[in-house]
Structures are given as structure tokens and as C-alpha cells.
Amino acid sequence: MVASGFLLIASFMLVLFVLSRPLGGFLARLIEGEPFSALQKVEAGLWRCSGVKNAEMNGWQYALAILCFNLLGIVLLFVLLMTQGSLPLNPEHLPGMSWHLALNTAVSFVTNTNWQAYSGENTLSYLSQMAGLTVQNFLSAATGIAVAFALIRAFARHSATTLGNAWVDLVRITLYVLLPIALIIALIFVSQGVLQNLDGYLHITTLEGVQQTLPMGPVASQEAIKVLGTNGGGFFGANSAHPFENPTAFSNFVQMLAIFLIPCALCFAFGQVVGDNRQGHALIWAMSLIFIVAVVVVMYAELAGNPHLSPLGADSNSNMEGKESRFGILATSLYAVVTTAASCGAVNAMHDSFTALGGMIPLWLMQIGEVVFGGVGSGLYGMLLFVLLTVFIAGLMIGRTPEYLGKKIDVFDMKMTALAILVTPTIVLLGTALALCTEAGRAGILNPGAHGFSEVLYALSSAANNNGSAFAGLSVNTPFYNLLLAAAMFIGRFGVILPVLAIASSLVAKKRQPAGNGTLPTGGPLFIGLLIGTVLLVGALTFIPALALGPVAEHLQVWLAH
């Protein structure tokens, strides 16, 4: 079993690097603005029809365009979800959502969170799934990548004032990257048996003579961008545990690769654009080391399972509760770490049924900001925030002004870095406290004790860090949780994006200084170790008290009793 686990991890990482490296080269060309003759006429036609000028923007113009674009997306999706009962492509005649659930869902999909307080097969029409959720899966992913593009340009350029054009970036990312790759992935999913139709639900009689309804729908097209764009919202309530969404071990492996593909490729692109591939490789090494350790811990915890099972007559202590037998413990553990290291949130098992230790690792990966590969775009700019913090700490230790890639990191940069790093922990801890201190918040907790606390902490961590997965023992389809989590998702998304763009605006104007004798090398093993230590230190200082009240206490209860 140990050999199988390491073989699975090694094969996953190998295929990931083989696929992401050439994609990184293509993304580097997009960042640098190289024209692509194949679609240049299509692009020019879009600018003429829309009346948008493709002149470059400064930092605040870029931020305003991104913010307005996403606010408009929230409004349009909210209206669609509220009125779906009166619109076509609704063969099951499903009514519109309640206003608070529609608001929660609109904010969720526009912010790339895809938190779902509903089950798709009995709540959403095909039109809402296709024109609403699937469209936002593309656009929210493009938003994150565009912000990463702007920050990469800020490091690569010097003595400049502009970061690119937000509209050009959004269109080119969608047209050249997301749509073609999503089409290929969708065809792979269809070949594996994922549904893709507009038929009405099938009403059948089982062998036992019981009536059963089989949901249909355009699943593969949404499933492809769900994983590629690290969105995570499932067409069905069971998400990727549903056999119509993720039917085989091969489709499961492809989903995991798709989740990490663009985040990993962006690291390669970063190194190419700044003119030093070692910088991108250092980020990948730091991310990979944390990721591999996390996977090993979850696999160990789930294989160890519950020590109380064998004395009760079970064949094994291993924890198969809430898992699909077609995937098994190893692939399920890998998927859980992939989806929470990235801001995806798709699940192929019930995270609420993991052991206390096995469930704590996905929770912790979200709490450190999902910087271990992370979401499309957000993973890279999140890790670069920790890079800036690391060089600042190193500068304090040796008494030098911190610098990164030849650019001095000043007071404003560090203020924005601190703001971006601290905004999500603040939301998580305050939101959890609010839920536990109010009657409306406590009413949703279905499990007592440490596990009930973990469910609330997981929900706020997932929402604030734009992940979307859940410990599903919490009743969240209430006005209190829908509004609380909507606020957490919105602030968690744009409370990081706006400081990142402010940092980019500051860095792009600076001159690049040649490296001196006292300059900290940022492409070697020493810096990789410092970076990992900084990520772990910030995560530990922020969340250890909360984790001690939840999963740590639950783990000790199980094993000390044994």
C-alpha cells in the first residue's frame, strides 16, 4: 500500500510537470503580449463590436475594470437564478431560488469559490447551469489569471506606469487558454461516460420495483471548466463523487491534473517572463514539498482510520466511510489534498467523514491561503505575497533593505502584503466566532463538540479562501449562513486582489537594481526553505488555537480513548 501511494504521487507529479511546462511557455507569450495570428482577426472584431480601447492601464484602472466586471457578473447571475422558473431550458420546471440563496450562489461563482448551499439536480435549470454557472466558471478563472499576469508584468518591467489591459487579458485568457483546453478535457470526460445532453430526467423502475429518477444534463462541458478553472462547483450535489460526473479512475486522474495544470504552468511562465527560470522553479519546489507532505499525512491518517473499528468486528481500521470504492483511499486522499491546496473545492468523497487528522490537512491548506499551487492565478500571486514577506524577514535579519528581482520592497509594499495576507484569516476567525456566538449560527450545527466546531471553521475557511468545499454536516441554506458566507467570499476575493494590484502598481514603477554582495539569492535551496518556513509560521501562528479546539481535540479524543 505504501508503494502504491508513492507511485500514485510520483506519477501525478511527473505528468503534471510534463504538461504544464509547455503551457507555461505559451502563457509567457500571452503575458508579454505577443500577437497570435490565428485569432487576431477575431480579437480585432471583438474590440470593434464592443467599443473597448485596448490601450494599457495603470494599476488603479486595471483594478477598477476587474472590480466592475465582477460586480456586473454578480448582478446578472443573481437575476438569472431568481427568474429561472420563467425561462426556457427548464424541463423539470424548477422554481427560482430564494433571494439569499441566489445572492450566495452568485457571489460564490463570480468569486471562483463555487460554494454550494444547494443540490444542483433539484435546484437549477439547464439554462442556469450553462448560461449562469458555466459562464462564470470561465470568467472567474480568467479574472484570477489576469491579476497574476498584471503582477508578473510588474516584476518584469521597470520604470513603467502600466500593467497591461484588463479587457485584453480577460479575452485572450478565455479565448486562447481556457476554451481550447476545456474543450479537450470535456471530450475526454464524455469518452469516459460523463453525461452531456439536454434531455429531461429519466424516471425508471429498479430491479426491486422501486421508482427512481435519474438526472440528466450538460455535465461534461461544465465539469471541464470546473476543474481547469479551479472552480469546483458540481453539476450534481455529490460533486465528483457522482458517477455521472466522475465515473472512472482515469477521469478522476484527469480531474486532478486539470486542477493543478494552470497554477503550475503559471510558475513556469513567471520564471520565463522575469528572465530567470530559477525563480519559477523555486516556487514550484516550495509548493511541491508542502504538497507531497500533506498528501502523505492524509493517506496515512485515512489508512490508519479509527482504532475502535477492529475491536467491534470490522475487517480493517482503514477509513472507507464516505469514499467511493472505485477510487479507494489513496486516490481519494490525493484528490482531497489537490482540491484544497488549489482553490477548487471539488470533492470525490465526503470530507466530513475523513478522520480528524485527515480532515485537518485540507482545512489547513485552505487556511494558509491556498498557496500550494493554489487557484488559477490566485495561487501564484498568493505565494508571491509570501515571497515578499520572506525577503522582508530575511532583510531584517541581515540589516538590509529587502529586495526581490532587483526591486526594493518599501513600506507601502509591505503594508499591502500584510493586508492581503491577513484579510482572510481575519474573516475566518471573526466569522467563526460570530457563528458560534449567535443562535442562528449555532442552529445549523448538527454535530456536537469538537467536530461541530470544525464544521463551522471549515465553512468559513472555505468561503474566505474561495475554495468551496465543505464539511457537509452543517446546515448552511439559511439567511444567516448564506449572507455571512457571501460576505466572506466577496471580501476574501477582492480584499486580496486589490492589495495585489496596488503592489503591482508600486513595483512596476521602480528601477531594477543589479544584485550586490548582500543580495539574498531567491532561486536556491536556502530561499526555498525560508519560504516554506514563512508559510508554515504564518499558518501556525494564526490558526493553531482554532485547530486545537476542533480537529486536534477530536483526534486526541479518538486515540487517547483507544
UniProtKB/Swiss-Prot annotation:
InterPro entries xrefs: KdpA (IPR004623)
Keyword terms: Cell inner membrane, Cell membrane, Ion transport, Membrane, Potassium, Potassium transport, Transmembrane, Transmembrane helix, Transport
Subcellular localization: Cell inner membrane
Chain ranges passing through the membrane: 6-26, 62-82, 132-152, 175-195, 253-273, 283-303, 327-347, 356-376, 379-399, 416-436, 483-503, 526-546
Highest taxon of source: Bacteria
Keyword Ion transport set for record: yes
Lipid bilayer topology: Multi-pass membrane protein
One Gene Ontology term of the molecular function aspect: potassium ion binding
Pfam families membership: KdpA (PF03814)
GO cellular component, one term: plasma membrane
First-listed, main subcellular location of the protein, grouped into a coarse class: membrane
Tagged with keyword tRNA processing: no
NCBIfam families: kdpA
HAMAP family for this protein: KdpA (MF_00275)
Protein family membership: Belongs to the KdpA family.
Function: Part of the high-affinity ATP-driven potassium transport (or Kdp) system, which catalyzes the hydrolysis of ATP coupled with the electrogenic transport of potassium into the cytoplasm. This subunit binds the periplasmic potassium ions and delivers the ions to the membrane domain of KdpB through an intramembrane tunnel.
Subunit: The system is composed of three essential subunits: KdpA, KdpB and KdpC.
Protein name: Potassium-transporting ATPase potassium-binding subunit
Taxonomy of the source species: Bacteria, Pseudomonadati, Pseudomonadota, Gammaproteobacteria, Enterobacterales
